[in-house]
């Protein structure tokens, strides 16, 4: 009878452990940033952002050169001008500096907004692809492996790239 009890307890323990193991969540991982950078849409968006940035940079550099030229001219002519004229010129230069600073801030804001608007649909497409592949393969959780110290489980990168045809 004692052996039967031990056998029953061992069997119950085994069944419980097996149930626990099969009840474990299926976990996968993917480096989302690497996936996004591999997407052709990302490369197109980055090229557009860089082009816009260079346009702003060219305009800013031209304005800086104009300001420097005007400063040199006004400095060279300062001795021959009246105090009133020099004060007027200083106000003009200060106005130009303020305008340039405002333009730089607006350019930075426009670039950030453009980047957000271009990347948002790309990130959404990557998220949807990851979700579709994970669901198709029965995964309950997908972690971004860029933030993990140790990534065990299936890496979905190859499958998601195949899903996106990249």
Question: What would you call each of these model-derived segments?
Answer:
Residues 1-26:
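Bacterial Sec-dependent N-terminal signal peptides
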Residues 24-166:
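Amphipathic, charged alpha-helical segments and their helix-to-coil junctions
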